[in-house]
Amino acid sequence: MEQLKIRHASAMPAPTWRWLHMNDTEICLPAELVRTGDVEIEAADELLNTAVTFEGAVAGLQERVDAARAGAPDTRACLRAALGADDAEAACGALSDLDVPALSAYQERAAREEAAGDVARAFETGIGTDARSYLNFAAGETVTIATGAGAEGRACVRVNGGAGTTVASSIDAVAAPDSTLSLTITLDAAGDGGSGGQQGAAGVVGSELRVFAGARSRVDVTVYVTADSGFTALDDSGYVLDEGARVQVRHIVLGGGTTATGMAADLRSDTARLDIDTRYLAAGTEVRDFNYVVRHRGKRTVSNIIANGVLAGASKKCLRGTIDLVHGCKGSEGTERETVLIADEGVDNKTVPTILCDEDDVAGNHGATIGHVRPEQLFYLESRGVSPEAAEALFIRAKLEDAALCAPDERIRAAVVRLGDRLIDGFAEELEGDAA
């Protein structure tokens, strides 16, 4: 089967040892898929009939950033090393060769980005440029959802995949100052199932999302991935937060043979806050890949990356979480924490939390808790008539039941129940019995 390959996807900003095979991933997509447009957008007319653009919102922020930077040149020696002698002397004044440090490729790139202070050029998404181009092409057009100043809005985007097709949405969400926006995205596809993994992909569902959270706005984004195991799901997003913005992101990844979830955020202005809550499940030979990059640029900014998941069968998961405390973000704090339950010996689990720091008076915290079902626990359950397969199903059922009970509408709940029936015999009946 001929394939398209997205190489170096979901790449870490500062790579670690290559032999760990965690710096990035390669996404394989069937080349012969038909591009279709089965995307439903449920939103009030005032959210869709707008002249507001993501680029315009970023340009407005750029004006304020430039005004704040005026008259305060950055004279650090690392900029001389990154910019070169001529540009650096103009920006920083003359320095001797002994004052110029040696920089890694990442440090040089970061220093140039800081010197430019260009919000638009610094914008990024979690999976990367190639995935963004693929999803935008598959979507055909980008739809803007925007709130007015001080207004409240709610929208739902449903991406419905099918065998032999590529279906994707491309959404720009712009929350005006002091407004509230709630956005739900579902990536769902029901098919013949397949064996999971990239080789058996029956189709692709995806979402490309750009979010601008205006000053003091409140943005809530929830993404449900409930595709059957024969499908590949791509969830790529990038966020820009203005002063005092509060953004809550929930990623609930329950299905899909191969899923790639990538998110990058620019906490550009002071006192912005970002909270990420990720919940995932993988069974059989399914693959889960996550990449989170949070750049703290404003003062007293806060971020939290919290992940919780269950891995069963011969599934694989890699989670990369990078918190970048950029020069100038004094008083900021970033935290990343993961809890994963490994229900089978065949699981391949990788987690690489990373804290990058170029500022003092900041805090970066990270940790991971990995729980195994110990042999003596399985022996105890077997002595009570519970087989290892039934014990594994208990953990899977708990994750699915939580997702079904918390689903925001009946269609999402039905998709979760469909996945449950595929993994566990009689899941729907037991769930209805518990609800009764």
Protein language model regions, located:
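Long, low-complexity, mixed-charge
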Residues: M1-A138
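Conserved beta-strand/loop scaffold segments within soluble protein domains that form the structured core
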Residues: E2-A9, R35, A90, A94-L98, ...
